[in-house]
């Protein structure tokens, strides 16, 4: 892999000073506030973007914000499944998860991916701690049944996929109080201890609601939400989102992302953004500068 230099490294001192000056009012405004970040896409697989993400998260913590990371891991799960001869399948953006797939999901998300993120943040000066839904009873869930579009009276069983029934945020708040950065794997647990695979966008949205987050940022592999002509939509209201769902503009993996974002906006999260995770330092650009890098979701 070619080690592409970080664009920030080639900025002149004057430009860097201007950037810091522009950030100051945002640092004041968001000091002490919780920022939930759904980390996924290319930003998880390209070394240059991994580094910029880790630096962004640590810098946000150092200047007084409280970042909480909820991570995905779809490509890593797909790779692990291929190694055992399985092919991933999806229904309405949700991964069909049989018992064998669930074992892989737990190992990949709660082990490999989570620990890589924790180590990456710690290596650049942060103090990250990994969690799954089982830790502190963080994410309680029940089996999810999907609506069958062909026959709504017959719900679709997609295996060990969960709906969140409760988020108990005490463990996250305790970590924040001790200046740690929580890194959460999207695995929930039922009352009987059954593990459930939960879409990371859904977990991020619910976590933002329960923590009373100031911002929710969903990282993706596109500039934001695009219309059918490929043009970036800078802002979306609830009414516009309904129209985009109806005409098929929003589909596939973007469905749970937009639905969770809208739910968070309706339930008290002040600012919800779909951001381009392929842009280095996209978190700093979205949070600490005048110019955003994606689509803003509003509840009205």
Curated annotation (Swiss-Prot):
**What residues bind substrate, as annotated?**
73-74, 95, 197
Listed EC numbers: 2.7.2.8
CDD domains (alphabetical): AAK_NAGK-C (cd04250)
BP GO annotations: arginine biosynthetic process via ornithine; L-arginine biosynthetic process
Arranged from A to Z, the UniProt key words for this protein are: Amino-acid biosynthesis, Arginine biosynthesis, ATP-binding, Cytoplasm, Kinase, Nucleotide-binding, Transferase
Q: Which InterPro entries match?
A: AceGlu_kinase-like_sf, AcgluKinase_fam, ArgB, Asp/Glu/Uridylate_kinase, Glu/AcGlu_kinase, NAGK-C
Pfam families named in the record: AA_kinase
Instruction: Please list the GO terms describing molecular function.
Output: acetylglutamate kinase activity; ATP binding
Site Transition state stabilizer: which residues? 38, 257
Pathway(s) per entry: Amino-acid biosynthesis; L-arginine biosynthesis; N(2)-acetyl-L-ornithine from L-glutamate: step 2/4
Record's keyword annotation contains Cytoplasm = yes
Where it sits in the cell: the answer is:
Cytoplasm
Record's PANTHER family?
N-ACETYLGLUTAMATE SYNTHASE, N-ACETYLGLUTAMATE SYNTHASE, MITOCHONDRIAL
> So what family is this one in?
Belongs to the acetylglutamate kinase family. ArgB subfamily.
Its recorded name reads Acetylglutamate kinase
- State the taxonomy lineage: Bacteria, Pseudomonadati, Pseudomonadota, Betaproteobacteria, Burkholderiales
Its gene is: argB
């Amino acid at each position: 892999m070619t080690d592409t230099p970080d664009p920030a490294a080639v900025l002149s001192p004057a430009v860097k000073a201007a950037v810091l000056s522009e950030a100051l009012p945002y640092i004041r405004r968001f000091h002490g506030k919780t920022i939930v970040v759904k980390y996924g896409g290319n930003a998880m697989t390209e070394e240059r973007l991994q580094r910029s993400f880790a630096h962004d998260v640590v810098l946000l913590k150092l200047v007084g914000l409280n970042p909480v990371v909820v991570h995905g891991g779809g490509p890593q799960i797909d790779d692990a499944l291929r190694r055992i001869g399985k092919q991933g399948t999806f229904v309405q953006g949700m991964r069909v998860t049989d018992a064998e797939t669930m074992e892989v999901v737990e190992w990949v998300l709660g082990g490999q991916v989570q620990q890589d993120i924790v180590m990456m943040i710690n290596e650049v000066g942060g103090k990250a701690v990994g969690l799954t839904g089982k830790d502190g009873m963080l994410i309680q869930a029940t089996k999810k049944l999907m609506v069958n579009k062909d026959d709504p009276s017959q719900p679709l069983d997609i295996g060990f996929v969960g709906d969140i029934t409760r988020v108990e945020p005490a463990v996250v708040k305790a970590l924040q109080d001790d200046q740690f950065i929580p890194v959460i794997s999207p695995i929930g647990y039922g009352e009987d201890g059954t593990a459930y695979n939960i879409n990371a966008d859904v977990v991020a949205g619910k976590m933002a609601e329960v923590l009373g987050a100031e911002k929710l940022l969903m990282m993706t592999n596109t500039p934001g939400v695009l219309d059918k002509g490929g043009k970036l939509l800078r802002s979306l209201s609830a009414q516009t989102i309904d129209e985009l769902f109806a005409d098929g503009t929003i589909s596939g993996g973007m469905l749970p992302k937009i639905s969770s974002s809208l739910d968070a906006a309706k339930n008290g999260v002040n600012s919800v953004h779909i951001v381009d995770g392929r842009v280095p330092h996209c978190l700093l650009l979205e949070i600490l500068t005048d110019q955003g890098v994606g689509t803003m979701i509003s509840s009205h």
